[in-house]
Amino acid sequence: MKLFLDTNVLIDFILERQPFYQAAAMVMSYAVEDKIQICVSSLSFVTTNFICIERCKMPIEIFRNKINFLREYIEVTSVDKTDIYNSYDSLWKDFEDGVQYYSAKRANADYIVTRNTKDFEENDIKAISLDETIKILKKYRENTNNP
């Protein structure tokens, strides 16, 4: 199973934002245990860096440590001109969400995990909340006989 994390989920995990952190950490734990694949767009890392360091004043050493940890478990998907043009040419209300969608599509993600599922309603990759993700992962674990 391959999950594409939207920027808000990555930020929730890195900043340990409540009440979202526990669910985000649980999703990450599945990747650490090699049960699933997680991908995040390069755009999300740029935005997350800005939010965490510039807006929230997270010390850069702490931010770098968290990113270094994630590097082992997350596939970074590229954003290319096709994603940009497709997002502009499509009917996406939010340009950034469109870019994320096209990056997830090229990565062959099964789901987009986001706190804003309504932003991704009309596409062929199902957008799910963190709570829905946990339910799906528990069923996935049962079906694959993983403890």
Q: Which functions belong to the PLM regions below?
A:
Residues 2, 73, 105-147:
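Acidic, PIN/NYN-like endoribonuclease modules and their adjacent C-terminal/linker elements
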Residues 50-78:
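Helix-adjacent hinge/juxtasegments
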Residues 100:
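Short active-site alpha-helical segment characteristic of glycosyltransferases
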